[in-house]
Amino acid sequence: MTFPDHRDSVGSVHDLLVAHNIPGIEGIDTRALTRRVREHGTLLCVFGPSEKVQEMELILEELTPPDADDLVAQVTCNGPTLLNPGAEDSEGRPLPRLAAIDCGVKHNILRELCKRFEVVWCPADMPLEEIIRDWSPDALFASNGPGDPAHPGAATEARKTLAAAVRHGMPVMGICLGHQLMGLAAGLRTYKLRYGHRGSNQPVMDLETRRVYITSQNHGFAVEDPVQGMLAPHPSGACSDTSDNVLGAEFMVRHVNSNDGTVEGLDLLDKPAFTIQFHPEACPGPHDASPL
């Protein structure tokens, strides 16, 4: 990293990192590190000069997991905004209005939604009563976002809005964190995966059609299987209900991860609502699930 070894080099990696104030590391046993992560799952860590091991250990003891913070509150928008007022389809007819609950939404998701709806971009803690009173949406969308879905902060407020919309009979779709919030509202538990689902090649099976989608995912939590518990394949997508279900509707598991059997999507049986754990628009990534 210190000395460039190519004839066309104009500097070293070390100099480049220093110039941009980026930490780097070299000379470690990567195989030992791989084994440790494999055995213990995702870990908090620090790195620094070998002569400062004790200082780094003290820093590590004081670290708190990022999921302990109210991450949704840090990334949601400040207030509601109508993104594409007066939006029309190709034949000049007004598009239906969608309230998009921002739990950390990607801009490309908003762009895709604006192709199909007149979109009201709403903060995660905005109650359904205010959304209906001020914007009169035809449907509601709960977005992706960071952190623990069970955190008692903005994510919990978004879950209340999501559940209220379902009980109201409004069409609802949740993706990623929105899917997990729907699972919690249905009375299921969420849990931290030992290894999160990351990347653009995650296979997901639709239990109704038996089709497998290649999907883009980036999450560290999952919704438990209502029949067989956590990390167990769901054999049939059978209808399930729980005592803590506040949706006012029964649901079924519709999608599962083909690698580890974790729940990837829920369908409500008598309400116009469904969820998926992955990113349907996948920017960047595969477009198998874009019709969803």
Tell where the protein language model's regions lie, with residue ranges.
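Amide-donor transfer/coupling interface in amidating biosynthetic enzymes
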Residues: 1-98, 103-117, 125-136, 152-168, ...
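The conserved SAM/SAH-binding core of class I Rossmann-like methyltransferase domains
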Residues: 101, 122, 175
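Gly/Ala-rich beta-loop-alpha elbow adjacent to hydrolase catalytic centers
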Residues: 174, 178, 183
